[in-house]
């Protein structure tokens, strides 16, 4: 047992003894639930922060606040609520009463205070403790040695402590909530209908990913947590709902990284009588609008860069992007789609770049892997990458002029993918062939290849109008709006490896 652990255990024991004293001597003060908190710290600061000491004395303003004790400075307590901080003043008689009733207050305790509002000699607002209650006795001490938590693992495992002591974390999740609300409002104004589709699928589909598997006992069938809502949302477009969107969780049984969490939030939407160009235009409008609304400017700091959401955003094909970021590679500079279709040529090119090549990779997969290896991380500013090969886009419509590629894009900011969209494949027979090709790929060892979904084919046979659809990764987008560089900083309770003990 470390010295730090011994000290913490001693403090916990002392606080438990105080709680026992409270229960024995003041039963009503064990865990009371009758305090009426009428005011928040930030509202008080905003309303009266400009008043002088004399003005406040003459006004006789009474306020009722409640929150967590974050610091003790002589007779002053710093109380934190959801909106911010304000001080409370405990005179000598109050301090004596607190000592008798509660054996004093500890940092972390939650209290309610009612009293007159005053201004301290240093110019800080405070509430005089005329009426007060200990609402919750904190048995564990808050981190004291640093300004908040510095151990990342502890921050993620004990997010509740992180939120108490780290203002930056609180602000990040407040911004996350605002981003989601702004997206929802934008979509509703564009006449999209919000819907909810199943979270458990009998056939996982809508993306190339490894699913989480479970079993439905009552139905006695295998079920999968959804990897994407796409096929259900497009069924709704078949049914006549021409503009739909959903903000919800997806689950993919894959690795953890600074940009990957197995449980993540996606906003996915579909619009009839539109194509992938309309999606790109809508995305520009949405993100420029949201950045300006929430941050006051479309230019946001991100690390050493400034991301400009104002638009217009760059648009270039995957092949052109590879050429742009490999200017000194003669083979790449002269490469055409005819060569991209040659799997042996692509294998040799990938190996020449030092890449490990999987035996089941197709021409399209090889092109995408080369793009990811040499170009993706260079895309700091908002950029649409188009021209995705059909063999890695089984749900996207083929391009009219070049059937090797599809009318699909992925949207990159900060060197990572944020969104994926395309003109939807609405040819039932072509979709049938592509599903079968995915099954062949799965049999060849690609465990991220899609399953065959016969009911979705049936839906397409009823007729899907020309449609475009897109998914936006909420977590990665919030990372940009909060200037954070790991996805776990914007997910309240991220997936974590089990602790050794």
From Swiss-Prot:
Cysteine pairs bridged by disulfides in the record: none
Keyword Cytoplasm carried by entry: yes
Subcellular location field: Cytoplasm
Gene Ontology BP term (one): lysyl-tRNA aminoacylation
Highest taxon of source: Bacteria
EC number: 6.1.1.6
A GO cellular component entry from the record: cytosol
Entries under NCBIfam families matching the protein: lysS_bact, PRK00484.1
PANTHER family (UniProt xref): LYSINE--TRNA LIGASE, CHLOROPLASTIC_MITOCHONDRIAL, LYSYL-TRNA SYNTHETASE
Name of protein: Lysine--tRNA ligase
Originating species: Shewanella halifaxensis (strain HAW-EB4)
Phylogenetic lineage: Bacteria, Pseudomonadati, Pseudomonadota, Gammaproteobacteria, Alteromonadales
């Amino acid at each position: 047992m470390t010295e730090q652990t011994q000290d913490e255990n001693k403090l916990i024991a002392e606080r438990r003894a105080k709680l026992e004293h409270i229960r024995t001597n003041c039963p009503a003060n064990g865990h009371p639930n009758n305090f009426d908190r009428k005011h928040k710290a930030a509202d008080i600061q905003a309303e009266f922060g400009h008043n002088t000491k004399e003005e406040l004395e003459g006004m006789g303003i009474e306020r009722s606040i409640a929150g967590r004790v974050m610091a003790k400075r002589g007779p002053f307590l710093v109380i934190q609520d959801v909106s911010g901080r304000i001080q409370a003043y405990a005179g000598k008689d109050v301090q004596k009463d607190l000592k008798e009733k509660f054996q004093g207050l500890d940092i972390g305790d939650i209290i309610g205070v009612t009293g007159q509002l005053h201004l301290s000699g240093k110019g800080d607002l405070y509430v005089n403790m005329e009426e007060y209650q200990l609402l919750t006795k904190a048995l564990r001490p808050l981190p004291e040695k640093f300004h908040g938590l510095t151990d990342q693992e502890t921050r993620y495992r004990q997010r509740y402590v992180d939120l108490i002591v780290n203002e930056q974390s609180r602000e990040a999740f407040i911004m996350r909530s605002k981003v989601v609300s702004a997206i929802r409002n934008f979509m509703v104004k564009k006449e999209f209908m919000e819907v909810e589709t199943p979270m458990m699928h009998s056939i996982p589909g809508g993306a190339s990913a490894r699913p989480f598997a479970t079993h439905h006992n009552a139905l006695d069938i295998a079920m999968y947590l959804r990897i994407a809502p796409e096929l259900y949302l497009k069924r709704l477009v078949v049914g006549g709902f021409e503009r739909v969107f959903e903000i919800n969780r997806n689950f993919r049984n894959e690795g953890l990284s600074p940009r990957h969490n197995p449980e993540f939030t996606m906003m996915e939407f579909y619009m009839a009588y539109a194509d992938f160009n309309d999606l790109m235009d809508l995305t520009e409008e949405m993100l420029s609008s949201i950045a300006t609304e929430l941050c006051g400017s479309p230019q946001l700091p991100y690390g050493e860069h400034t991301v400009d959401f104002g638009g217009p955003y760059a648009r270039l094909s995957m092949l052109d992007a590879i050429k742009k970021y490999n200017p000194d590679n003669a083979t790449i500079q002269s490469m055409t789609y005819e060569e991209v279709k040659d799997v042996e040529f692509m294998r040799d090119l990938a190996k020449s770049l030092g890449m490990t090549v999987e035996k089941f990779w197709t021409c399209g997969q090889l092109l995408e892997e080369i793009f990811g290896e040499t170009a993706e991380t260079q895309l700091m500013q908002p950029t649409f990458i188009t021209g995705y090969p059909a063999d890695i886009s089984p749900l996207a419509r083929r391009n009219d002029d070049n059937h090797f590629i599809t009318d699909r894009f992925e949207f990159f900011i900060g060197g990572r993918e944020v969104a994926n969209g395309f003109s939807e494949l609405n040819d039932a027979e072509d979709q049938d062939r592509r599903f079968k090709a995915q099954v062949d790929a799965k049999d060849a060892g690609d465990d991220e290849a899609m399953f065959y979904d016969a009911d979705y084919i049936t839906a397409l046979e009823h007729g899907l109008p020309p449609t475009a659809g897109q998914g936006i990764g909420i977590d990665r987008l919030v990372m940009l709006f909060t200037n954070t560089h790991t996805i776990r900083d914007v997910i309240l309770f991220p997936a974590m490896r089990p602790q050794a003990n």
